[in-house]
Amino acid sequence: MSVLFTILLMAVIGGFIGAMTNYIAIRMLFRPYKAVYLFNKRLPFTPGLIPKRRDELAEHIGKVVVSHLLTEDAIRARLLDENLQREVTETITKMFHEKMKLETTPNELLHHLGYENAEVRSISWLERTLEIEISRFLTTKQSTQMSELIPSMLENELTKKLPHVTERITSKMSVFIASEAGKIQIKQMLQKFFEEHGKMGSMARMFINIDSFSEKIQQEGLKLINQEDTKNIINQLLTTEWHNFEAKELQELIPTEKQAHLAGQLTSEIIQAVPHEKLFNQPIQGILRNYESAITEKMIPFAVERMLDFVATHSAEIVERMDLAKLVETQIATFSLPEIEKLVVEISGRELKMITYLGGILGGFIGIIQGILAMWI
């Protein structure tokens, strides 16, 4: 009976020593947090392993995360994953539909973004910019011929339209001359002609019937206007005037002293033509509603795909610039030692307990062997 008791006692003592040894070893990973001094000499194993190697641990964890976890290939693969693209697209689409239920004007949106008096400031900026740019254009181009300022496409179109302009002019002239107003105008011109020539005019009026003579001039005028030679002459005149206009420099048409006034006038006309009150006070949703399906079905998926593809393509540069290793190291360094201990215990508390129990089991087994050997010796 004493033999069995001795063996059991040795087992209990060995188990206790083994369990306590492992428990103390585990605690020494974290404790003490600071070095302990005795007679001005630091005691061994103080501070604990993790507090002592905290900076090195943070640095190595950062390197491991970047080298083996958040690698360039892993990030690129995740960004190009179809499931991620679908989830991001669905999230943005949902947010878009939620915003479409609201009534938000550009003024309100810019106000939320911290841009006060958006309408007034935007119009003022546009007005200043337009006037500056128009003035700069007039100044830098004042020695340039109009042919260089007019776009070639517009120049070609205007040149092609000259015969049509001629037809338009002759047509309008024919209509006017053939009208009653034209007849009256011709008669008044004849009367004025006779009056301006004094006695000779008075004598001519004695032999000429103004009404019949006016009708004759009206008829001959219509014949003259509708002749091809007349149309050709008008067309040649228009062409010549057009070429003369193109050959002129800008400063001939707009003298330097009038450029500032013209710039201000053009700016004022443009600003008045812009419906800024409607633009800034009309709900954005009303403008977008006609394109809602196109935005959700085409634009958002396309934008998400392009965005993720861009980030994936430049993932190496982004990771390098973000310096994830340093970021992880910095974040770990901000943890207090109790927080690190709590984090490790929460993650591997069960395993740490099993190590303690294993120490007790091994200690007990060794105690049994020691008890048996003690009986034999």
Swiss-Prot record:
The keyword Disulfide bond does not apply. One of its GO terms (cellular component) is plasma membrane. It is a multi-pass membrane protein. The chain crosses the membrane at residues 1-21, 357-377. It is found in: Cell membrane. Its main location: membrane. It comes from the Bacteria. Keywords: Cell membrane, Membrane, Transmembrane, Transmembrane helix. It holds the Pfam family DUF445. Belongs to the UPF0754 family. This is UPF0754 membrane protein lin2327.
